[in-house]
């Protein structure tokens, strides 16, 4: 299950108690204080990693707790400190304080770490309180409690290419073709209920690092107002470097394909006004349903209505025209 939002309580460990103890040796009946300090409690640290893709591991968890520090011991022995708890989250995670809404950190780099809940300090044993005046202190202090923090985690996928389109525009079929993987395909709305990630290999430069492609669930009119799957998935376009609009141009009895693109542009602009700063390409999909002269007429219609956009005629089903996508990706993404 793809989980991209979660609330957790992160509890650091309590510090161990200091102890009162006395040095006891045969020839030192009054050997003085010998109680050790308590160990520090473990802290809770969040770490970003590219090896996990969602918060599924924490789906049924309300809180995570680091170990407590151990109490001190005789012979001036300090208690063992609690081990820090490392919470692994996907790169692209936005961390907020659940109580204030304050953004604490934006994890965009693999290996980034942030200490979120500090472990409690260990208490002091009576040896710590020995002075020239008080040579036999009977005082020891308890360990301090660890910090407890309620946080919200929100994932915004980091991908090179994001497939954007209405339900049943053929995004999943095209995704399977480009990423050489399989996601569920069907002729009904919202076949894709969660973003799918795949890798696209550059055909002309096989030594190059693959591109990450994301199949964003179908957008409907009013998505920016949280209709359909709405805002839950619109946010996944925010960090995508290149947007690939997928438009169904097959013969059908509904809105014109041009109106579909107009609506998609409106929805994305309403959610992220500066989205057009990204590289964009429009794939006119399902041309296997059109005759050659109809394909050319379709292309000219789009070019006339949207002169600032780049278009490619393709069939995700047959693979026709897909090489044009690879060429565009190479021009815009290859380094």
From Swiss-Prot:
Location of the region described as Disordered in the Swiss-Prot/TrEMBL record: 126-145
Catalytic activity, EC: 3.6.5.-
A molecular function (GO) term: GTP binding
Keyword annotations from UniProtKB, A to Z: Cytoplasm, GTP-binding, Hydrolase, Magnesium, Metal-binding, Nucleotide-binding
Organism: Chlamydia pneumoniae (Chlamydophila pneumoniae)
Residues that hold Mg(2+) according to the record: 172, 192
Annotated positions binding GTP: 165-172, 190-194, 215-218, 285-288, 315-317
Cofactor(s), names only, from the UniProt record: Mg(2+)
Protein's job: An essential GTPase which binds GTP, GDP and possibly (p)ppGpp with moderate affinity, with high nucleotide exchange rates and a fairly low GTP hydrolysis rate. Plays a role in control of the cell cycle, stress response, ribosome biogenesis and in those bacteria that undergo differentiation, in morphogenesis control.
GO CC list: cytoplasm
BP-aspect Gene Ontology terms: ribosome biogenesis
Family annotation (SUPFAM superfamilies): Obg GTP-binding protein N-terminal domain, P-loop containing nucleoside triphosphate hydrolases
Complex formation: Monomer.
The keyword Magnesium is assigned to this record: yes
Occurrences of domain Obg (ranges): 1-158
Protein name: GTPase Obg
Main location group: cytoplasm
């Amino acid at each position: 299950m793809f989980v991209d939002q979660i609330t957790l309580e992160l509890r650091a460990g309590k510090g161990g108690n200091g102890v009162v103890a006395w040095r006891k040796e045969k020839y030192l009946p009054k050997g003085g204080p010998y109680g050790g300090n308590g160990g520090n409690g473990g802290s809770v640290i969040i770490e970003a990693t590219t090896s996990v893709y969602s918060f599924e591991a924490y789906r049924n968890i309300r809180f995570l707790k680091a170990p407590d520090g151990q109490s001190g011991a005789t012979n001036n022995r300090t208690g063992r400190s609690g081990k820090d708890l490392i919470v692994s989250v996907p790169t692209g995670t936005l961390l907020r304080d659940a109580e204030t809404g304050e953004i604490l950190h934006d994890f965009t780099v693999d290996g980034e770490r942030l200490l979120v809940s500090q472990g409690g300090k260990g208490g002091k044993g009576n040896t710590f309180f020995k002075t020239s005046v008080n040579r036999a202190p009977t005082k020891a202090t308890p360990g301090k409690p660890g910090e407890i923090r309620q946080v919200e985690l929100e994932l915004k996928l980091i991908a090179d290419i994001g497939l954007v389109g209405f339900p049943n525009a053929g995004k999943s079929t095209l995704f399977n073709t480009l990423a050489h993987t399989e996601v569920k395909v069907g002729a009904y709305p919202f076949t894709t209920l969660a973003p799918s990630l795949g890798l696209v290999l550059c055909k002309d430069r096989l030594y190059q690092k693959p591109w990450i492609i994301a199949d964003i669930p179908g957008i409907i009119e009013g998505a920016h107002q949280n209709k359909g799957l709405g805002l839950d998935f619109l946010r996944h376009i925010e960090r995508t470097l290149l947007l690939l609009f997928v438009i169904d141009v097959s013969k059908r009895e509904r809105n014109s394909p041009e109106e579909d693109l107009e609506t998609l542009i409106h929805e994305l602009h309403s959610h992220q006004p500066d989205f057009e700063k990204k590289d964009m390409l429009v794939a006119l999909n399902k041309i296997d349903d059109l005759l050659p002269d109809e394909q050319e007429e379709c292309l000219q219609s789009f070019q006339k209505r949207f002169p600032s956009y780049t278009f490619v005629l393709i069939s995700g089903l047959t693979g026709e025209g897909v090489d044009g996508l690879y060429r565009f990706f190479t021009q815009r993404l290859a380094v």
